[in-house]
Amino acid sequence: PAEPSEQIADLRRRATDAAADRSTGQIPTAPAPEQADLAVLVTRFQTAGVPVKYSWIGRELPDDKGLQLTLFRIAQEAMTNILRYAPTTRRVEVTVSRHAGTAVLTVDNDAAPGSRPMHGSGKGLIGMRERAAVYGGTVDAGPTSTGWRVRAVLRWDEDDDEGTSPWQMPL
C-alpha cells in the first residue's frame, strides 16, 4: 500500500486538477453547503486518506445560515490549503469550540519530518479573514512547532442565539 504522504499528494493532485477550469486555471466556487456539510467535509477528507480528527466542544451554532456558511468555508479553505501546500501532512485536527456568542475554529496539521512547506499567494487567507470580519471575527494563520495552524474566531450577539441547528456536529 502507498504511504499516507503519497496518498495525500495524489489526492492533492487529483483535487486541484479535477477542479480547475481548463480555460482559466481557476478553481470554481461551489454552491452553498447543505445541512451537515462541515461533518461531511471532514468525512470526505478522511475517506480520501487524509488523517483528520474532528471535534466539537459546546453547544450548536445559532440557526444563522450565514454564520454556518462562514465557518464551513473557512474550514474548507484551511483543509484545502493543507492538500495544496502540505501534501506530506501526517495528521490534521479540526476543532470547533462554541462559547457564549463566539465560535473558535482551529485547523492544525502536523508535517512529516523533513518536509518543506510550500507557499501560496495568500489570497485564501485574505478570503478567510474577510469572511470572519463579517462576524466581528479574526483569522490567524502561521507555523507551529510541528506544522501549521489556522485559527478563526467568529462572534455574534448572544441575544440572537437560538442554537437550533445541529448541522455542524461530528457524525
Protein language model features and the residues they cover:
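Glycine-rich ATP/GTP-binding catalytic cores of kinases/NTPases
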Residues: 1-171
